[in-house]
């Protein structure tokens, strides 16, 4: 067993539920020992407490008056999908092509309009733990062996293989100059776009216990890279050389035990002009000035390990209890909160047309009105569930189910 102090996805959800149920400190300490002693082992979360009884079971779905439906346009099988491990491999879009990968090393390119497979590359004996990146003419994935593999967007041929310090579970980002990856050991590394050689590395201080996952870094117009870390800080560094520009806390650790002090920034950041939005687990949702790091506004107790989306003048986030919340993007005012999907392990929200879309552990996609937060549409897209974030493209919704089915849907 590997001791690394990280909480994996299924365990992450179980921890949230256990904390919400108010379990005794002794029980929580036992969970910590389990996590730190067996990190990386694929366990069934329902067996944690040697009981068939679920802590905070997922809320049952109720009938809705559907105002919108999903019609499937095309679908493609992508290897073994999310595989047997708790991965969250999200595809990436560049131009009119979507790039997807499976946990067992299949990477492919699909025409967004027709669903035709343009190329397929099987990365032999490599397991992919995280999302796909696309930019600067490359498709980038990471391996469990701390490799970064860059493929040509047009052909799928391997351009280079770089080495980083740990596995990459967040989507890489890339431009014509560099590829930037964030690894689970809280390091951000820039690799040369052409050669794959390391250009710079930025390292943050990692707490004793963290959630397994990282947020995706973002490029800014100020020629910087902004990244969120497991110690609850948001950091801006120069894209040219990795030199520190500014740092600000999204959350402050509180509590006596390590598990109470987990404040990871795991969800993707949102860049909007001169502002950047971030949220943290057991922390806050904040808006900062991207040039200076100055906090513009903050919403306290907005615990989330998912990303944020934007639409209709609102920010949308999913809480650690799978509540979907709308907040004004100019202030911390809450517009609405939907608790109908409580504990259903929903994905990060995606804004599409007049709706916010999320998917859950049973494979249902829920369409929520951006205006009042009602669920107005529901379709099941994968019997094995959906963990990958949904994508929006020209009014169509792209899903990547756990079984490996990549599909595009129109809203009718």
Model-derived features with residue positions:
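Structural signature of WD-repeat beta-propellers
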Residues: 102, 143-144, 183-184, 229-230, ...
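WD40 beta-propeller blade core
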Residues: 108, 149, 189, 235, ...
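Short loop/turn segments that connect beta-strands within beta-propeller blades
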Residues: 111-114, 152-155, 192-195, 239-241, ...
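Bacterial N-terminal signal peptides that target proteins for export
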Residues: 4-27
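Extracytoplasmic beta-rich repeat domains
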Residues: 41-46, 52, 67-92, 120-135, ...
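C-terminal motif of bacterial Sec signal peptides marking the signal peptidase cleavage site
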Residues: 35-37
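Loop/turn-rich, solvent-exposed surfaces of beta-rich toroidal or solenoidal domains
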Residues: 314-326, 333-367
């Amino acid at each position: 067993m590997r001791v690394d102090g990280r909480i994996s996805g299924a365990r992450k959800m179980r921890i949230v539920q256990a904390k919400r149920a108010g379990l005794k400190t002794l029980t929580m300490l036992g969970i910590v020992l389990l996590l730190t002693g067996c990190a990386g082992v694929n366990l069934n979360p329902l067996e944690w407490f040697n009981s068939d009884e679920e802590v905070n079971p997922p809320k049952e779905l109720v009938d809705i008056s559907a105002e919108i439906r999903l019609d499937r346009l095309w679908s493609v099988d992508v290897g073994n999908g999310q595989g047997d491990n708790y991965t969250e491999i999200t595809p990436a879009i560049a131009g009119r092509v979507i790039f997807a990968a499976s946990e067992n090393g299949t990477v492919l390119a699909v025409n967004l309009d027709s669903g035709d497979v343009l190329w397929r590359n099987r990365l032999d004996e490599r397991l992919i733990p995280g999302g796909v990146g696309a930019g600067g003419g490359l498709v980038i994935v990471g391996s469990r062996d701390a490799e970064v593999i860059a493929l040509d967007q047009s052909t799928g041929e391997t351009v280079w293989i770089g080495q980083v310090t740990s596995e990459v579970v967040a989507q890489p980002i890339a431009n014509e100059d560099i590829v930037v990856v964030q690894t689970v050991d809280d390091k951000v590394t820039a690799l040369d776009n052409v050669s794959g050689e390391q250009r710079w590395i930025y390292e943050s201080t990692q707490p004793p216990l963290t959630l397994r996952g990282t947020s995706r870094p973002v490029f800014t117009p100020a020629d910087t890279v902004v990244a969120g870390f497991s110690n609850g800080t948001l950091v801006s560094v120069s894209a040219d050389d990795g030199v520190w520009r500014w740092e600000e806390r999204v959350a402050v650790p509180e509590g006596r035990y390590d598990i109470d002090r987990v404040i990871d920034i795991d969800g993707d950041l949102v860049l909007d002009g001169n502002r950047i939005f971030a949220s943290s687990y057991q922390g806050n949702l904040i808006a900062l000035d991207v040039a200076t790091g100055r906090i513009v506004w903050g919403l306290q107790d907005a615990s989330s390990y998912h990303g944020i989306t934007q639409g209709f003048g609102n920010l949308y986030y999913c809480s650690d209890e799978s509540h979907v919340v709308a907040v004004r993007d100019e202030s911390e005012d809450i517009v609405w909160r939907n608790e109908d999907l409580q504990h259903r392990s929903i994905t990060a929200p995606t804004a599409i047309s007049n709706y916010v879309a999320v998917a859950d552990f049973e494979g249902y996609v829920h369409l929520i009105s951006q205006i009042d937060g009602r669920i107005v549409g529901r379709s099941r897209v994968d019997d094995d569930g959906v963990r990958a974030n949904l994508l929006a493209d020209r009014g169509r919704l792209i899903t990547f189910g756990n079984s490996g089915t990549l599909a595009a849907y129109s809203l009718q």
